[in-house]
């Protein structure tokens, strides 16, 4: 509602409004600026087009200012047709309390909009407004909207960066990227990876652990300790009728047992594990199976200090790949 960029833009908005009026739109509010007044102000303007299907100008002419045009629609499908008629839009807003209607509108109108805001009672109080630039969202639209993704939001940064594909063997790619990738060579030595300091550990340093055979007693003990008495672990008859055919080991026990195989006890440079990514249980492990763990350093990075105290210890962040295999040579848990 504030001033436009300059008087030339104000003149351009006035000319666009005049064209819309000439095409058959009715002025409900505003419509004419005082071109002799100081400042590039244009009055809030509301137009009404009673025949939107027969008035192509209302879809083709964009008065880039505080101007809006009301258009009636017969039903939902007609509303979608009108929403797409502009041939590309930076942003659109749908005001509705119906999730079903919102889904239908998104699926039908998304291809013609860079962004669609769904406004209802829950979101209205914190609404950023129609088309406000936000770093997490695309800022730009298709077709006649002219693109613009390179002008706003986090995605815009990538438009100013070159993407180059690098092709080579896994070991070569790991060397170039300073990050171990699956299939690359590993380095096994007599020093446990957890005993190495930041300067010593390298991507690709790996440990293949001893083996451990899992028993029904392990399943029962873990169930009693954790409280997880799920039938696939504890009910022999019900488990036999499942897709597994028999009882299976708890997935979370496998993770714990794996830690018992690869962790090096005692005071070491490694201090804690703060999470696991891409954990998948892709094969069942059953009583009598023997597991073995492969631990590989993927990459290492220096962790920024939270304290300005020069005496604060330096921390580093290591990313590791774990793969649990069974005696049947299945990779049952990669993460």
From Swiss-Prot:
SUPFAM superfamilies: ALDH-like (SSF53720), Thioesterase/thiol ester dehydrase-isomerase (SSF54637)
MaoC-like domain location: 203-306
Biased composition (Gly residues): 140-151
Pfam families the record matches: Aldedh, MaoC_dehydratas
Database matches in Gene3D superfamilies: Aldehyde Dehydrogenase, Chain A, domain 2 (3.40.309.10), Hotdog Thioesterase (3.10.129.10)
Start and end residues of each stretch annotated as Disordered: 123-152
GO MF: oxidoreductase activity, acting on the aldehyde or oxo group of donors, NAD or NADP as acceptor
Family: Belongs to the aldehyde dehydrogenase family.
Listed name of the protein: Protein MaoC
Gene name as annotated: maoC
